[in-house]
Amino acid sequence: LNLLMNNRWAAFAVGILVLAVACGGSSPTPVPEASDAKFQPPAEKPTATSIVPEGSLIVPKIVPDVDRSIYSVPLEDILFDTFGTTRARFVPLSEISDELQTDLRDAIIPVDFPAYGGADALPWLDDDDLVLGYEAGGEAFAYPINILNFHEMVNDTIGGVPLLVTYCPLCFSGVVFSREVDGQTLTFGNTSALYQSDLVMYDHQTGSYWFQVGGEAVVGTLTGARLEPLPSATMPWGEWRALYPDTLLITGADGGLETLFAGAVYGNGIGSGYQDRVNNGQFAFPVDEDKLDGRLATGEIVLTVETGGAVTAFPLGEIGDGAVNAEVGGEAIVVFTTAGGRSVGAFFRTVEDQTLSFDYQGDGLFTDRETGSAWDFAGRAVKGPLAGGLLERVSTRRSFWFAVAISFPDVEIHSP
């Protein structure tokens, strides 16, 4: 696993280095050659290595080849990260060989057999480290972003729901999806490709390619299908643990790797300077300028609420600490945010046929104007006439603005 992670982070670091050099002058970031068909890869290509035995994290599989004759985005815009196996920094889907395409599959290993432990299971996990949180059947599950930086997706079934936890480090996008599409349960892997600097996944059942932020199939037989986003929340680990003391924490994978993620290497995160570079339009992988939406800075972190067939983006930097009462798709919702937008969640705000309006009162509590009841960040009424009540979470995505705008060109932006 060390070699695998070094490959991914080395590739990421190269992109950052190029961006840093570009910041020193006015000329645009140089774009490397797209491909080099004559170059022979090293005799020993990168493997999933000595620390993690091959196949121990992922489902053994025979995956159909993606049908490249069916697509909704240009094949040349889907770029494979070669991790140094060719002279080219990336190779487009329109030019990649079948052999290299297969070799790069799951070079970033997803987790198909997750193991969980208690809140103290990861010694490196600090209270300020972000986690992607999910609730089901009275249980809470936490997925540290530092782990998702390395593995990017987790296939699991929780509370009888087949789900996919996803994260793309290049656009800070954390989304939980249902894995069910038209009655079929899909299992997902990593193509090692990116579209508009966002993770491209594939499904084992059809080989189709999926754009992560939108959850949309863009190449293959399922092109046009979308995954259903599920409610989740992002917040610092200390806050999640305080809300859910009995939370389960992903710690590794079944089959002897249950404590794999306790290793100190997983404590490494991405430097804060990356967001500034994205705001300056300097991406680690190419992004089509025609697809950028200037209504917000490209690196603005937004929470996107999707319900009732509508999508609305809430700029977290503008909101700060507060409660935003809004309507999306005809549904009354509220966005709770604290810690300068690092803690964020969204809920339907109708309780027992009464629509509530919320204000932030401090100390992680929110008060509804109608009854004066106090609610915590988990949507639980802890004081007042509605004590014991619970708000229902709404499906969300947390991401850089550029990825949301590309996924949903007609997205609305909430303005106070």
Where are these regions (language model features)?
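Intrinsically disordered, low-complexity Ser/Thr- and Pro-rich stretches
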Residues: 1-2, 44
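Bacterial N-terminal signal peptides that target proteins for export
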Residues: 2-13
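Bacterial signal peptide processing site
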Residues: 24-27
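Mid-to-C-terminal functional-domain signal that highlights helix-capping/loop sites
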Residues: 30-416
